[in-house]
Design a protein with these regions (language model features):
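Conserved helicase motor "Helicase C" RecA-like lobe of SF1/SF2 P-loop NTPases
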Residues: 19-38
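Conserved interdomain hinge at the start of the Helicase C-terminal
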Residues: 1-18
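Short, well-ordered alpha-helical microsegments
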Residues: 24-25, 44, 64, 68
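Conserved RecA-like P-loop NTPase helicase motor core
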Residues: 49-139
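Long, largely alpha-helical accessory region at the distal end of helicase-like NTP-driven motors
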Residues: 122-181
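Beta-propeller and closely related beta-pinwheel folds
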Residues: 1-3, 33-51, 58
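Conserved beta-strand elements of the Class I
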Residues: 13-17, 33-35, 117
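Short secondary-structure boundary/capping segments
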Residues: 30-35, 74-78, 92-97, 143-152
Length: 181
């Protein structure tokens, strides 16, 4: 799926958030554009102001889960790929010595929720959010860690699980339906 999403060109903004530059390689090898911190503001402004007459490639950013506001057509597809990493020394140390401690679990949930909020900024806004990576999916669906998410996020996760179970009976014989939207 990673290479599939990276190969497409979109008539709207599409964003993948990965926990490290290493995780971005599959996307960039297939056409996704890795955007560094110094280019991020320009890319966000481009996506916000674009009328999408010309299709755009998937924007890939590394370990930036907050501070990006991509409402409306600036982001109609958001991919969160794998469990986030901690950047600061204190959290990184805590994660290594107590990976299942409440504090780390709460901080991970907060970081994931911040990522989920990048594309939907208001009640009339919408986007498709794809969670990838066994570690991330396990974390958000685990009964213990699920309690660290807000009620709204828990509901979104339940809706996603329902959609996934319904879609198991169907398969895309062609990606033309996806490309139409």
């Amino acid at each position: 799926l990673r290479s599939y999403f990276a190969k497409l060109e979109y008539p709207f903004g599409a964003l993948a958030i990965v926990p490290s530059n290493n995780k971005s390689k599959i996307y960039t090898a297939n056409g996704g554009e890795l955007i560094g911190q110094e280019e991020l503001l320009d890319r966000v402004n481009f996506l916000k102001s674009n009328n999408f007459k010309d299709k755009v490639r998937l924007t890939v950013i590394s370990n930036k889960y907050d501070g990006i506001d991509l409402a409306d057509s600036a982001c109609r597809l958001l991919i969160l790929d794998s469990l986030p990493y901690f950047e600061n020394l204190s959290d990184s140390y805590e994660e290594r010595v107590r990976p299942s401690g409440d504090l780390i679990q709460k901080k991970l949930a907060q970081k994931i929720e911040q990522g989920l909020g990048r594309s939907v900024r208001g009640e009339k806004d919408y986007s498709v959010i794809v969670l990838m990576g066994n570690d991330l999916v396990d974390f958000v669906t685990n009964t213990k860690t699920k309690e660290y998410f807000s009620a709204e996020t828990q509901q979104q996760i339940e809706i996603g699980k329902t959609i996934m179970s319904l879609s198991k009976d169907e398969s895309f014989s062609s990606d033309s339906e996806f490309k139409k939207h």
